[in-house]
Amino acid sequence: MHLRYLLLLSLLALSACGFHLRGTQVASRTNVSELAIKSVSAPLIAEQVSSQLQLGGTRIVEPSDKTRRVLTLRNETFDRDVLSVSADTGKVKEYQLTLHVDMSVTDSKGKPVVDNETISVSRDYTFDESSILGKSNEETSLREDLVRQVSAQIVRRVNAVTK
């Protein structure tokens, strides 16, 4: 009986502090009622941004002359740079994975509200040749996480310029 109360109290404390599992957040309301998204070489980001905006209540439409705002995403690139090398073996110990994407927002007259702004997010991870498969999976997971982070930044930026 006491264990049940202790478990209930622990769950209440955990939820009260704002903890939630990554990827389970419910998107907050967006300031944009309607938005067109044009993707020029940024398919992963465009899909994620569209999804986050729709969860926030934004209707995604096709770009046209009547569209009030158009978000253009370009040049989605992942870079993997060496962060550290082992002094003994000369082999890579750490990498830094960076995602860059260019964004711009225009109004209904084609006037830029946000003009060619680059959003970048980086994460580093250790590399071990003895577990290449595991590290490959870790890199894939990091790439997905970077896409979510950049997309969230873009949504926040779009919200900020449409207040």
Predicted regions and their residues:
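Surface-exposed short loop/turn segments
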Residues: 72-118, 122-137
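Sec/Tat-exported extracytoplasmic proteins
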Residues: 53-57, 105-109, 153-162
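Short acidic low-complexity segments
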Residues: 58-69
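Short coil/turn motifs at beta-sheet boundaries
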Residues: 28-30, 66, 90-96
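A structural "domain/chain start" motif
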Residues: 16-58, 161-163
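Sec-dependent bacterial lipoprotein signal peptides
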Residues: 1-15
